[in-house]
């Protein structure tokens, strides 16, 4: 602060190179001593620069700074005009300020970056002596006037002269002064900036004693302290300054722990329109570092050969190729996440125009695709295709069922024709001729009449009509005479002669 205030009195001190910034605190100490000596000698220049009442209105030191007790950071405004300041005596004439103001943040400050230089400028413009900044923190503390702090430097602490002329005022003969903000220091030794000055010089040269307990001590800076007039994004934060960030703000991380950023949309659009440019392609491929998602079937070959697909995806990890540029543009939207097509009804976005068209049909109820088999309508062609496959499967099942039924019927017909009962009769019929022919004479001689009378031939002939009709030729060739009499005559002839004698009376009785 002291360095900034000494630079304001340019004609009196003849400071060489007033725009050199920053100054060391020890560079301006001889000049301060010279100013105090001039003031104690009664130099009219210093007394004319600022009236005695300009600093202390009624002669009471610190009266003008009663409203600055405590934390006065939010009470000082840059827009406060000169007319708002209350002075008991003469007011300063309006002065037009021209020049260049340079505020450079102190990188070695442990807490704030802009507070002290900013309020040095505010105090110079408004005309109020700001309270000195506490050394460990950048918050402004209303401890005592700056004039007393400058007079409490060891080199000039013994003088009890008035230091009111050292206030932030402008010499009337210099209409265009140039102000430079004082540098901020992260630490300072107590012999340069003591915490509280025991002696405060008055305007009449008498010294009054003030206890240090009257003023609040320097409080530690809150890590969440921030100047509301300066946005946080105007300066970059180093790794050692992450503790300065408020807890509700995320610190800036390095690119090593982050996911690589997506390629800008204008870059991909330019690549899609100028795919043939090799220089452009090399530049864009260097920017496309985001790993793409794996393909569902990476080893499946494409139907189109590679030489017929000249449009390759610019993403390094994507091996997709396309035969048309619009297909490539549509594919690139997968990587970028661009959805330029928006539904005007529900405001939903889509990456493809055909997806938007089919989506609009859900709102309108339009179903232009009808099934050719059952007539059912669908809003999308793929839905109709999927529905048609159901009919095809049903048709195939019916065809399979019909084929199995036909096969079963043919097999049953073949089995019936192969195992018919008519074909089983020839063997027993053909086996009888030998025993019948072996006894032709006994049957005809002994029991010719009884058999014919007991079992008439018409009854026997009606018993087996099919057999006699089916094998008429075979039976006729083998047995030209009565077949029935030959078949049933053999059991009668087999009994013994005594049985024949016993049966003969019965036959006689029957007759």
From Swiss-Prot:
Q: Where is this site: Interaction with DNA?
A: 309, 320, 324, 330, 348, 352, 376, 380, 386
**GO terms under cellular component:** cytoplasm; nucleus
The C2H2-type zinc-finger regions cover 311-335, 341-363, 369-391
Stretches for region Disordered: 133-169, 291-312, 384-406
Gene disruption phenotype: Knockouts show subtle abnormalities in the inner plexiform layer, outer plexiform layer and Muller Glia cell tiling.
Tissues/organs with expression: Detected in muscle and brain.
Q: Which GO terms describe its molecular function?
A: DNA-binding transcription factor activity, RNA polymerase II-specific; double-stranded methylated DNA binding; hemi-methylated DNA-binding; promoter-specific chromatin binding; RNA polymerase II cis-regulatory region sequence-specific DNA binding; sequence-specific DNA binding; zinc ion binding
GO terms (BP aspect): camera-type eye development; circadian regulation of gene expression; embryonic retina morphogenesis in camera-type eye; embryonic viscerocranium morphogenesis; positive regulation of DNA-templated transcription; positive regulation of transcription by RNA polymerase II; regulation of transcription by RNA polymerase II; retina layer formation
Localization recorded for this chain is: Nucleus; Cytoplasm
SMART domains in UniProt: ZnF_C2H2
What keywords tag this UniProt record?
Activator, Biological rhythms, Cytoplasm, DNA-binding, Metal-binding, Nucleus, Repeat, Transcription, Transcription regulation, Zinc, Zinc-finger
User: Where is composition skewed (Low complexity) in this entry?
Assistant: 137-169
Q: Which domain of life is it from?
A: Eukaryota
Q: Which InterPro entries match?
A: EGR1_C, EGR_N, Znf_C2H2_sf, Znf_C2H2_type
What ranges does the record list as Basic residues composition bias? 386-396
Q: What is known of its domains?
A: Binds to DNA motifs with the sequence 5'-GCG(T/G)GGGCG-3' via its C2H2-type zinc fingers. The first, most N-terminal zinc finger binds to the 3'-GCG motif, the middle zinc finger interacts with the central TGG motif, and the C-terminal zinc finger binds to the 5'-GCG motif. Binds double-stranded target DNA, irrespective of the cytosine methylation status. Has reduced affinity for target DNA where the cytosines have been oxidized to 5-hydroxymethylcytosine. Does not bind target DNA where the cytosines have been oxidized to 5-formylcytosine or 5-carboxylcytosine.
Q: Which family does it belong to?
A: Belongs to the EGR C2H2-type zinc-finger protein family.
| Physiological role | Transcriptional regulator. Recognizes and binds to the DNA sequence 5'-GCG(T/G)GGGCG-3'(EGR-site) in the promoter region of target genes. Binds double-stranded target DNA, irrespective of the cytosine methylation status. Regulates the transcription of numerous target genes, and thereby plays an important role in regulating the response to growth factors, DNA damage, and ischemia. Plays a role in the regulation of cell survival, proliferation and cell death. Mediates responses to ischemia and hypoxia; regulates the expression of proteins that are involved in inflammatory processes.
Q: What's this protein's name?
A: Early growth response protein 1
Q: Which organism is it from?
A: Danio rerio
């Amino acid at each position: 602060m002291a360095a900034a205030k000494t630079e304001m009195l340019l004609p009196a001190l003849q400071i060489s190179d007033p725009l050199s910034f920053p100054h060391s605190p020890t560079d301006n100490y001889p000049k301060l001593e010279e100013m105090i000596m001039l003031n104690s000698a009664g130099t009219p220049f210093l007394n004319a620069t600022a009236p005695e009442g300009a600093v202390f209105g009624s002669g009471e030191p610190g009266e003008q700074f009663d409203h600055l007790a405590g934390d006065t950071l939010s009470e000082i405004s840059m827009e406060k005009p000169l007319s708002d300041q209350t002075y008991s005596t003469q007011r300063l004439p309006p002065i037009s300020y021209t020049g260049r103001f340079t505020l450079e943040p102190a990188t070695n400050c442990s807490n704030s970056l802009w507070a002290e230089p900013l309020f040095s400028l505010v105090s110079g413009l408004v005309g109020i002596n700001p309270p000195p900044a506490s050394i460990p923190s950048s918050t402004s503390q209303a401890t005592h006037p700056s004039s007393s702090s400058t007079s409490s430097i060891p080199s000039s602490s013994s003088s009890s002269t008035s230091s009111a002329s050292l206030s932030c005022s402008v010499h009337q003969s210099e209409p265009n002064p140039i102000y430079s903000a004082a540098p901020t220091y992260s630490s300072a030794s107590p012999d340069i900036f003591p915490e509280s000055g025991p002696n405060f010089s008055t305007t009449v040269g008498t010294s009054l004693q003030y206890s240090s307990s009257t003023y609040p001590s320097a409080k530690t800076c809150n890590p969440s302290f921030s100047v509301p007039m300066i946005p946080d994004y105007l300066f970059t934060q180093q790794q050692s300054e992450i503790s300065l960030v408020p807890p509700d703000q995320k610190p800036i991380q390095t690119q090593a722990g982050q996911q690589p950023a997506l390629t800008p949309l204008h870059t991909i659009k330019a690549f899609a329109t100028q795919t043939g440019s090799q220089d452009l392609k090399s530049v864009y491929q260097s920017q496309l570092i985001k790993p793409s998602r794996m393909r569902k079937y990476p080893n499946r070959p494409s139907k189109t050969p590679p030489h017929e697909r000249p449009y390759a995806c610019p993403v390094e990890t994507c091996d997709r190729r396309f035969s048309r540029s619009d297909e490539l543009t549509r594919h690139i939207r997968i990587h970028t996440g661009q959805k330029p097509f928006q539904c005007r009804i529900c405001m939903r976005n889509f990456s493809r125009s055909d997806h938007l068209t089919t989506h609009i049909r859900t709102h309108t109820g339009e179903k232009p695709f009808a099934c050719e088999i059952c007539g059912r309508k669908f809003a999308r062609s793929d839905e109709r295709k999927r529905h048609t496959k159901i009919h095809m499967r049903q048709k195939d099942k019916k065809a399979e069922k019909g084929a199995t039924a036909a096969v079963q019927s043919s097999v049953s017909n073949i089995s019936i024709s192969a195992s018919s009962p008519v074909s089983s009769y020839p063997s027993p019929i053909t086996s009888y001729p030998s025993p019948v022919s072996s006894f032709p004479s006994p049957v005809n001689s002994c029991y010719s009449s009884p058999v014919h009378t007991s079992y008439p031939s018409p009854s026997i002939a009606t018993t087996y009509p099919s057999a006699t009709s089916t094998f008429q030729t075979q039976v006729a060739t083998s047995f030209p005479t009565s077949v029935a009499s030959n078949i049933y005559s053999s059991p009668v002839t087999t009994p013994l002669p005594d049985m024949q004698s016993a049966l003969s009376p019965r036959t006689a009785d029957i007759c």
